[in-house]
Amino acid sequence: MSSPAAQTPYALVPTDAEWERLDAQHNGIAKFLDHKLAPVDLGQPKKILEIGSGSGAWAIQAAKQFPDADVLAVDQNPLPARPLPSNIRFQQLNVLEPFPFPPGSFDIVHIRFVLCHLPNGYTVLPRIIELVAPGGWLLVDDIDFLHAFEGLDKAPGVKSGFTGLIKSMESHDADPHFGKTLKGLLESSSALSEVNVQKVELPINPTPEXPALGPLSRTMRQAFSNAVGAEKLNPDTVTKGGLTREVQQAFLNEMGGDAQDWSYSVHLYFSWSQKRV
């Protein structure tokens, strides 16, 4: 692996609290997706790759659903110590560097909420597409942190927290709105024969009453609270995003309250695309 200075920029430091946050976020999203990796028949994959494996939660789900597949989880940080299915392997790497895999190596490639954090993430996507085998599936999920702050006049702490997060991402050429570009980027690839993108307009507050959206809203609200309000942040994030402890505490106080007089939404994008044969 490269030296720490060459790692991909990321606001959060790998801690037990971060692993718990990622597990909870995965579990909430998995419930929303009906515990399916994708809403299509993925066949009988033999090799599965997850890029940006974090706590390993998605890789564990994939390994259990496809016990005959070899699941490779990759990330710039090691997986936390936890029980893993026997068909999971881990490899430490930096996604900004050339992949050490031949083109077409994997029947399924998955990446969630990673491209938005990368400098010029749109340049990384074609290299990821290359890794998918002909007829295989690319599963990309990402987010758009909306700049629509009109509903936050009565929640200045929430506004400052999300503003700081967006500023810190933009400071290293990441794209907090990457999700809204995903469909166009995928459709522009001649290597894909089928592109499907599901856009989810998700209110963080007030919590939606819809049976599916309500639990997902609560999941993501808690995930954002634990991320922006984390005790340990990348120092660069604090400096460039202005996420001081005072800003964090105001964010946590309002996100943890039950006031209904403010509103904010994010857009989530879930995609499944098939590689041309």
UniProtKB/Swiss-Prot annotation:
<comment type="function">
    <text>Methyltransferase; part of the gene cluster that mediates the biosynthesis of strobilurin A, an antifungal polyketide that contains a key beta-methoxyacrylate toxophore that targets the complex III of the mitochondrial electron transport chain. Strobilurin biosynthesis begins with construction of benzoyl CoA by step-wise elimination of ammonia from phenylalanine by the phenylalanine ammonia-lyase str11, oxygenation by str8 and retro-Claisen reaction to form benzoic acid, which is activated to its CoA thiolester benzoyl CoA by the dedicated CoA ligase str10.</text>
</comment>
<dbReference type="GO" id="GO:0032259">
    <property type="term" value="P:methylation"/>
</dbReference>
<dbReference type="InterPro" id="IPR029063">
    <property type="entry name" value="SAM-dependent_MTases_sf"/>
</dbReference>
<protein>
    <recommendedName>
        <fullName>Methyltransferase str3</fullName>
        <ecNumber>2.1.1.-</ecNumber>
    </recommendedName>
</protein>
<comment type="similarity">
    <text>Belongs to the methyltransferase superfamily. LaeA methyltransferase family.</text>
</comment>
<dbReference type="GO" id="GO:0008168">
    <property type="term" value="F:methyltransferase activity"/>
</dbReference>
<dbReference type="Pfam" id="PF13489">
    <property type="entry name" value="Methyltransf_23"/>
</dbReference>
<keyword id="KW-0489">Methyltransferase</keyword>
<keyword id="KW-0808">Transferase</keyword>
<comment type="pathway">
    <text>Mycotoxin biosynthesis.</text>
</comment>
